[in-house]
A protein has these predicted regions:
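A conserved P-loop NTPase coupling/switch region
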Residues: 90-169, 173, 283, 352-353
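Structural recognition of the conserved hydrophobic beta-strand(s) that form the central parallel beta-sheet
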Residues: 59, 318-325
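Walker B catalytic acidic pair
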Residues: 293-295
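Conserved lysine of the Walker
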Residues: 23
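Nucleotide-state sensing region of NTPase/ATPase domains
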Residues: 34-113, 117-119, 125-131, 135, ...
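Conserved NTPase motor "head" modules and their coupling/switch loops across ABC/AAA+ ATPases, GTPases
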Residues: 1-18, 159-173, 177-289, 298, ...
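Post-Walker A helix-loop "phosphate-sensing" segment adjacent to the P-loop in P-loop NTPases
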Residues: 32-43, 274-282
Length: 358
């Protein structure tokens, strides 16, 4: 994106343009201000334009009680990124997570179904971290201890058991918190997800989620101790909450094996809308932002219509939608009562289309 300054509608903002023009980058800038990182590229320096030495993203928000908030992120090549709230720099970026809750639905979500278990763990982490600081702290502690244990496992010289125990005890303590909170979350989340899926599919299929963890049947410390000899042969930790799995079912079978493109897409949209609903009712005093990037592709007309009915309702706050198809956007706008803005995106520049309702 080139330098862009935009004023958004408080309700609905639509962006249309051909692929590769910058629509997704625009949503990614909004995402960055919520999560301190890009949705698509975890390497910060790669988010700087090739012909530039830095990037800056600045967002001006209004909380539900009317309080203004300014969020700033800036980064120069070969320097640490700066993240500020109301001109005061964060010492820990994790303190910002959850302040501006956000849910994004994008084509990259297909990895939730087709990718490895790490994608599904990340889905749980992203939701729970936005409303539960204890969870985020436990997850950070667990991952640090896991990295230290893996370093010991790779050591070619014998390592004293006490050293292993230091990190295993930390993994067990933090891992039990992670397991308990993931289990509580999934139990509450399943009925919300199922109700969204049945609304979009008009009750055509049944769906489910099953959470599996090594922490379920035994103490995590015992699991780690028992696995240590095998782990040393492999050079990494084979068991623990970093191997948890969230099984995604269509009927009684894995959707990865059974689902059509339309069913997979419906599943992903329902997961993310349930994530939104869950965040809205759990702890946050701010309605999450909703980012919908090219979500109507591969869906039949009736499912598109059901999704449009959902997002046009009062349950959602500020929404950002991208599509290559102007007709899709016009169909949504017909159903919207109240404020919206439409923007055209071309070759990295963004222009508001006048004549549209503000």
């Amino acid at each position: 994106l080139e330098q862009v300054e935009l004023n958004f509608s408080a309700k609905l903002n639509c962006f249309f343009g051909q692929n590769g023009m910058g629509k997704t980058n625009l949503l990614d800038a909004v995402y960055f201000l919520s999560f301190c990182k890009s949705a698509g590229n975890p390497i910060d320096s790669q988010n700087i334009r090739h012909d530039a030495d830095f990037f800056v993203i600045q967002g001006f928000y209004e909380a539900s009680d009317g309080t203004p908030e300014e969020i700033y992120c800036g980064m120069k090549r070969r320097q640490k990124k700066q993240f500020k709230r109301n001109k005061k720099e964060y010492t820990r970026l994790s303190d910002h997570i959850g302040f501006l809750p956000l849910v994004m639905v994008s084509p990259a979500d297909s990895a939730l179904i087709n990718g490895g278990s790490d994608e599904r763990r990340r889905f749980m982490d992203v939701v729970i971290s936005q409303y539960d600081k204890e969870y985020l702290d436990a997850l950070i502690r667990y991952n640090k201890a896991l990295a230290q244990r893996n370093t010991l496992l790779k050591n070619e010289m014998p390592v004293e058991e006490e050293l292993f125990l230091v990190w295993e005890e930390m993994m067990a303590q933090a891992g039990e918190v992670v397991f308990r909170k993931r289990e509580e979350f999934i139990k509450e989340f399943i009925p919300i997800f199922q109700s969204f899926y049945s609304f979009i599919s008009q009750d055509k299929e049944k769906v489910g989620l099953i959470y599996d963890s090594h922490a379920r049947d035994a103490s995590l410390l015992e699991v780690l101790k028992e696995s240590r000899t095998r782990d040393q042969i492999m050079g990494f930790s084979l068991r623990g909450v970093h191997k948890d799995e969230l099984n995604m079912l269509l009927g009684d079978f894995p959707i990865k094996r059974e689902g059509s493109q339309g069913q997979n897409k419906t599943y992903l949209v329902a997961l993310k809308l349930a994530q939104f609903d869950f965040l809205k009712r759990t702890g946050s005093n701010t309605t999450p932002l909703l980012l919908l990037d090219d979500i109507f592709d591969k869906l039949d007309a009736s499912r598109v219509e059901q999704i449009v009915k959902l997002v046009a309702g009062d349950n959602f706050g500020q929404i950002f939608i991208t599509d290559t198809n102007r007709e899709h956007l016009d169909k949504i706008l017909e159903n919207i009562e109240g404020k919206y803005k439409v923007f055209g995106v071309e070759n990295g520049s963004v222009a508001e289309r006048k004549g549209d309702t503000e």
